[in-house]
Curated annotation (Swiss-Prot):
Any GO MF annotation of the entry: N-acetyl-gamma-glutamyl-phosphate reductase activity
Organism of origin: Prochlorococcus marinus (strain MIT 9515)
Name of protein: N-acetyl-gamma-glutamyl-phosphate reductase
UniProt-listed Enzyme Commission number(s): 1.2.1.38
Enzyme class label: oxidoreductase
Family the entry assigns: Belongs to the NAGSA dehydrogenase family. Type 1 subfamily.
Source superkingdom: Bacteria
Predominant subcellular localization, coarse grouping: cytoplasm
Length: 351
């Protein structure tokens, strides 16, 4: 299958090239960029060898359609919407790594992404409704038949995977869910930003986006769908002075306070028994971001505080892989009829 990587020189694009360049099931048939168009891949990234198709082209719907069956859109929020309809009309399937199609309502996207909405005058509510949310653990059948897939954000991925087994079975209350997440700086993208300068974020830990972080509404949308009830939760992200990795600690109230840590671990393990990239750790073993770095795995742990009937869920992912591009490749595999983790059998070179 021929794959176009659009936005090839951002972190999402770089990871996509790395994951697909040696995969015999796919051919990277097109590399597209804005600022880097007209340059060679090897000039930008001499340490990542491509045997062919070394030129980064100007982004063009016609060129993508001529050369690719599927387009991975690794672009800033808002830009994907300027390409998607044209690509779909020409028969190109789209896997979008931005937030443009994560919401079922265009109006909601416009409210949450108001700055982008002011810049990009969208009129594609029909595509928002059509897009399939690309979390394979809950949508693998719909993903396999989709022509437009919206890859989840990194924070929602790290929060929803541990929550879904308990929300879907009504094991935890819909109220009082708290998500405390920490991310490496690569989650902010490759564009320069003062807060991501080493002298600004090094040797420090800081929260940001309290109450109104964009991923709050994304998590709430999917959590509400899974539980069948409207859910409002508290989500606080933090910036860690490391390059890649994400750690989420999630708190909830058990409806049956008699459940133990072992009971809840079994619930997690049974729910994800068919997903080899999801590892449920033994009780009292708590995951480290270092364990999943450079892999598409997610490690989960659970502990119950029987004094107050609370459950504590822990998850770690590599924010650039399971939190972004690795998940996009899982979606690509599903629409290609291939095993979910094809090409994602990566080894963590610990330490």
């Amino acid at each position: 299958m021929n794959v176009a990587i659009v936005g090839a020189t951002g972190y999402g694009g770089i990871q996509s090239v790395n994951l697909l360049k040696d995969n015999k099931n796919y051919k990277i048939s097109y590399l597209g960029g804005y600022k880097t168009s007209g340059t060679k891949w090897s000039d930008n990234f001499p340490f990542i060898k491509l045997d062919s198709n070394n030129l980064i082209e100007k982004i063009s719907i016609d060129r993508i359609a001529d050369k690719a069956d599927v387009a991975l859109l690794c672009l800033p929020n808002g830009i994907s919407s300027t390409l998607t309809r044209g690509l779909l009309e020409k028969g190109v399937k789209v896997i979008d790594l931005s937030a443009d199609y994560r919401y079922k309502s265009l109006e909601q996207w416009k409210r949450i992404y108001s700055n982008e909405a002011a810049k990009y005058k969208r009129d594609d509510d029909d595509l928002c409704k059509e897009a399939v949310y690309g979390l394979p653990e809950i949508n693998n059948k719909d993903i396999s038949k989709a022509r437009l897939i919206a890859c989840p954000g990194c924070y929602p991925t790290s929060a929803l995977i541990p929550l879904i087994p308990f929300l879907s079975q009504g094991i935890i209350d819909n109220e009082g869910i708290i998500i405390d997440s920490k991310s490496g700086t690569s989650g902010g993208g490759r564009e320069s930003s003062q807060k991501l300068l080493f002298s600004e974020c090094g040797d420090g830990l800081s929260a940001y986006g309290l109450i109104n972080h964009r991923h709050t509404s994304e998590i709430e949308q999917i959590a509400s769908f899974i539980s069948g009830n409207d859910i409002e939760l508290l989500f606080t992200p933090h910036l860690l002075p490391m390059i890649r990795g994400m750690h989420s600690t999630i708190y909830g109230r058990l409806r049956d306070p008699g459940l133990t840590s072992s009971d809840c671990r079994i619930i997690l393990e049974n729910f994800y028994r068919n997903y080899s990239n999801i590892r449920v750790l033994p009780v009292d073993i708590y995951p480290s971001t270092k364990w999943v770095k450079n892999t598409n795995e997610i490690h989960l742990s659970v502990k119950v505080d029987n004094r107050n009937g609370r459950i504590i869920l822990l998850s770690v992912i590599d924010n650039l892989l399971k939190g972004q591009t690795g998940q996009a490749i899982q979606n690509l595999n599903l629409i290609s009829g291939l095993p979910l983790n094809n090409g994602l059998e990566m080894i963590n070179h610990y330490p």
